[in-house]
């Protein structure tokens, strides 16, 4: 298992981009990034050696065969962490520090770079699956920012079940303007546009099986 400091990581990334032409001609490794929501470092036994009383063998295998990082700096927010990783920018530049409400203008902008856009010239096919948290308008979806495919929800953990609450406003105009979108399946098209399907709300019942969708 290899442990890398932040400085070594930055140096490695710089060397990688300098030699991108050489890499483009060679076989490329698969890149799998797993974001865990609301977990601590000790919840993954690759870091904690199982002190929580259980093991995470599949994730531990990824760590053993690849790299394990010990330092990462971001705000304690899903949106801030995802935006920092995907764009390589801090929240003072992107403004993506907190989760936006349905229909909010807060989200990915046209000028924001993404890791997917950097990988495309190297021949990678890219996808994002699960929670996104970087804006719910069409222009903010991952498939408008370098990803070939996206399947997931756009809000915090239980936002899409809120309309099930008995005190949720029933006014159709309110729901149309402020209600959450469902689970989105989208694709980037060759002409620069997107194909977008709303597969329906992420209800409490659907949460039991949604992992089987992908």
PLM-predicted stretches and their roles:
Residues 2-7, 17-214:
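Formylglycine-dependent sulfatase
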């Amino acid at each position: 298992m290899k442990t890398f400091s932040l400085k070594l990581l930055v140096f490695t990334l710089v060397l990688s981009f300098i030699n991108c032409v050489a890499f483009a001609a060679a076989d490329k490794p698969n890149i799998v990034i797993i974001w865990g929501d609301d977990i601590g470092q000790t919840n993954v036994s690759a870091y904690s050696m199982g002190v929580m009383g259980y093991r995470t063998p599949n994730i531990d295998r990824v760590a053993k065969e690849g790299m394990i990082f010990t330092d990462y700096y971001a705000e304690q927010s899903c949106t801030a962490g995802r935006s920092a990783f995907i764009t390589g920018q801090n929240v003072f530049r992107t403004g993506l520090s907190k989760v936006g409400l349905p229909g909010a203008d807060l989200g990915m902008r046209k000028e924001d770079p993404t890791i997917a856009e950097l990988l495309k010239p190297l021949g990678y096919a890219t996808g994002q699956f699960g929670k996104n948290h970087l804006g719910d308008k069409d222009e903010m979806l991952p498939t408008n920012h370098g990803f070939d495919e996206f399947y997931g929800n756009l809000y915090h953990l239980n936002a899409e079940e809120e309309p099930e609450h008995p005190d949720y406003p029933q006014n159709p105009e309110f729901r149309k303007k402020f209600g959450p979108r469902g689970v989105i399946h989208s694709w980037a098209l060759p002409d620069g546009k997107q194909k977008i399907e709303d597969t329906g709300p992420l209800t409490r019942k659907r949460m039991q099986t949604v992992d089987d969708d992908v």
